[in-house]
């Protein structure tokens, strides 16, 4: 009987330890911020300016943890990377153009928030940009902590982790020559548009 009791308690302790370990390592299935949709459009800027801008709208689903102060997620950084495959010029080859920009939100409340980026009309006209880019990806971080990519964070042309990593590597090497061309909303003529759906941004441009 004594041996049976020892065996029972030993198995019980092992089960508790395993359950505890599983609880500790299990990843959260509900990140604080997640990309729910990304849409692209061509549109004219307000106040009668000429030429179409290329707009990328990133819809974010925000779910602060219950213990978060004010039920907000602070300092959310959104980085958008675009990869366009452009037609070949006469006698040439098709080429890729990469653009990257980021914007940091002061804080996001529970619910939906939209973050927008724009390419100016000169590029839209020169490269005939319209529709979805061939490749795109969105990276998120909150208070300096990277948030794992969700299902809506990348284009359908990048279904696998290896393809996404390759895209980010190529973009890191190729986006430098286009630095500053993809612009967050607050640096464009659309700064005062979508007032109800636009969060406040951290501003770091030189004065």
Model-derived regions, located:
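Structured domain cores in non-transmembrane regions
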Residues: 68-133
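A structural detector for beta-sheet-dominated domains
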Residues: 41, 63, 118-120, 141
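Internal, hydrophobic beta-strand segments that form the core of beta-sheet-rich folds
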Residues: 76-83, 122-173
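Short, compositionally biased P/S/T/A/G/V-rich stretches that sit at domain boundaries
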Residues: 22-50, 171-207
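Surface-exposed extracytoplasmic segments
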Residues: 63, 67-68, 143, 163-166, ...
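Bacterial N-terminal signal peptides that target proteins for export
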Residues: 1-12
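Hydrophobic h-region of N-terminal signal peptides that target proteins for export
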Residues: 12-22
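Contiguous beta-strand segments within globular domains
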Residues: 47-65, 69-77
